[in-house]
Regions:
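Catalytic or ion-coupling anion/metal-binding cores of large enzyme and transporter domains
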Residues: 1-54, 59-81, 85, 91-95, ...
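Glycine-rich, highly charged phosphate/nucleotide-binding loops
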Residues: 95-104
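A short, small-residue-rich loop immediately preceding and capping a beta-strand
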Residues: 110-131, 143-146
Length: 558
């Protein structure tokens, strides 16, 4: 049954406050007729610094056009939008703190102003999950429009992908690559706008938003510069008005079943390891506090790798788009999905994908023809990670599926990089980078260390990286991250010593510090650590003191 305007949030009366708002809106030039329309927030994370978001102002105009034509009043508001690639060098690292802030911004702006519905525009790593967390928290009609993937660059007559340029960082540092070639790759490997064209966190989160039903079908595999994505933005504006009138809210879309659908798709496409932080956080905001890492682990036993996309594979997101995109991917995965989940367009997952076509069955494979029987991601447990740790299995060299090595321990990313550059890390070492977790240092990424290690093939093909910090969505190699509990919480990771042996068995999903239980407990009793925060600004101190564990999604514990 269609809701009347009188029943909508923006029409609720608050006496003098209502008249004040009415007067202020009229003073800005809005008409009485416009003020009698449903009020729709266009939550636009556009800015001029983030290449994934620099074009969202154009998409927002199309969204607003659709809202107006469908009888609503669109009002554009903003949120923070930090580009992961712009802040990678800063060891403080602010992606996860910014994600939580973005969800808070959505709550305060949209709820405080009594909008009837919202369309949220975002593309990149922390912004898409922040917007989805805000949707789940407020539980009003909402659609997410993701900004599309970045066009491939061209260099010396060939298309190039950014991840291949990043692979050369270590070689350039050691003088093993021609500077002109390197600089040319850096200059031409990124297109004008959109999410970086591999399964980094940006594209991974866009795909998860679609997999859980919060975008219109096909959104996550559209080019940022295509006519299709502008058309979709307009249709999102039309559709949000239908959702407002029908009373369809975010928590009718974001359910335990739809989150499981997203996890299944994540396994099939080897999405970013950062999803193990974001999906549990979104679920929490919707009211579902399940042991989500165990769900990831269970799903890894039933969903193999079906699309071998970069960085671990050979195909770009553009290749994925041309092969049929997300609708085709989900159609072939339907036996592992809940096809009855509702999506924002009013149709079920099954209805949305039933007519999808696969144009390249090597890029989008079926369950009976996987790239590998292992999933994209895996959860490793053991005495070194009692609550779990995450590895991108699809990007691990085959010879490192079973590993045992001696620890080289570093209490910061800076210390690890100095040792690597000084030649103090040797073949087969287990490089332990700790106090980089959410409380220790805001979820610092070990991406820089990993990229420089990649420039030393002998080390890259024999060493392990083990950290309570995170990895970029472009992670590869034997890289175990998100070790939980983190070192700052007096965990087993905090008491690892140089030359301790560490064993990683990926098929068995285990990670083991090879010391006795008695020795481990004795070391833990002696360990003490306290966060001072004196070197950080106020918000980061606030984050460190109030954030929860990696395994629970890094949500506020307040």
């Amino acid at each position: 049954m269609e809701r009347k305007y009188e029943d909508m949030r923006s029409c609720w009366e608050f006496g003098e406050a209502s008249e004040c708002r009415r007067g202020l809106m009229l003073g800005m030039g809005y008409t009485e007729e416009e003020l009698n329309r449903p009020l729709i927030a266009v939550v636009n994370s556009w800015n001029e610094y983030n290449p994934g978001h620099v074009h969202l102002n154009q998409l927002a105009e199309r969204v607003k056009q659709g809202i107006r034509e469908a009888g609503g009043l669109p009002l554009e508001v903003g949120t923070t939008a930090i580009c992961d690639g712009m802040v990678l060098k800063d060891p403080k690292y602010i992606e996860i703190p910014s994600r939580n802030l973005i969800a808070d911004q959505v709550e305060l702006t949209v709820d405080g102003n009594f909008f009837d519905g919202m369309v949220l525009l975002s593309t990149c790593d922390s912004i898409v999950p922040g917007h989805l967390m805000g949707c789940a928290r407020l539980d009003i009609p909402a659609i997410v429009v993701t900004g599309g993937y970045m066009p491939l660059g061209t260099f010396r007559g060939k298309e190039v992908v950014h991840i291949r340029a990043q692979d050369k960082v270590g070689a350039m540092a050691e003088g093993k690559i021609d500077p002109d070639l390197y600089n040319g790759l850096i200059q031409h490997s990124w297109g004008i706008c959109g999410g970086c064209t591999s399964m980094t966190t940006a594209n991974s989160m866009c795909m998860m938003a679609e997999a859980m039903g919060m975008t219109l079908p096909g959104n996550s595999s559209m080019s940022a510069v295509s006519s299709e994505i502008r058309n979709l933005s307009y249709r999102a504006g039309l559709r949000i008005m239908e959702m407002v009138r029908q009373g369809i809210t975010a928590r009718q879309i974001i359910t335990p079943e739809s989150i499981r659908n997203a996890i299944a798709v994540d396994m099939a496409v080897a999405g970013s390891s950062n999803l193990i932080l974001h999906l549990p956080a979104i679920a929490h905001e919707a009211g579902y506090d399940e042991p989500w890492w165990k769900v990831f682990d269970e799903m890894s036993n039933t969903v193999p790798l079906l699309s071998h996309l970069m960085p671990g594979g050979e195909y770009s997101v553009k290749d994925f788009d041309l092969a049929g995109g997300m609708p085709a991917r989900m159609k072939n995965l339907l036996p592992r999905l809940n096809g009855d989940c509702m999506t924002v367009n009013g149709h079920t997952v099954r209805e949305n994908v039933e007519n999808a076509v696969v144009y390249n069955d090597d890029v989008i494979r079926t369950l009976d023809n996987p790239v590998m029987t292992e999933p994209g991601l895996g959860v490793l447990y053991g005495n070194l990670a009692p609550e779990g740790s995450i590895i991108k299995i699809a990007a691990v060299p085959k010879q490192l599926m079973h590993y045992r090595g001696k620890a080289k321990v570093f209490n910061s990313l800076h210390d690890g990089l100095e040792a690597l550059r000084a030649g103090q890390i040797h073949e087969g070492d287990a490089c332990v980078l700790r106090f980089m977790g959410l409380k220790g240092r805001f979820g610092t990424t070990a991406f820089t260390f990993q990229e420089e290690l990649k420039g030393k093939p002998t080390l890259y093909n024999s060493c392990a990286i083990i950290t309570d910090g995170r990895f970029s969505g472009g992670t590869s190699g034997l890289s175990v991250g998100y070790v939980s509990p983190e070192a700052a919480l007096c965990s087993p990771l905090s008491i690892v010593e140089d030359n301790d042996e560490i064993e990683i068995d990926i098929p068995a999903r285990s990670i083991t510090l090879c010391i006795s239980d008695e020795e481990l407990n004795a070391r833990l009793e002696k360990f003490k650590w306290e966060f001072s925060g004196k070197d950080y600004q106020r918000f980061l101190r606030l984050f460190s003191r109030n954030v929860g564990s990696m395994a629970k999604g890094g949500i506020w514990e307040v």
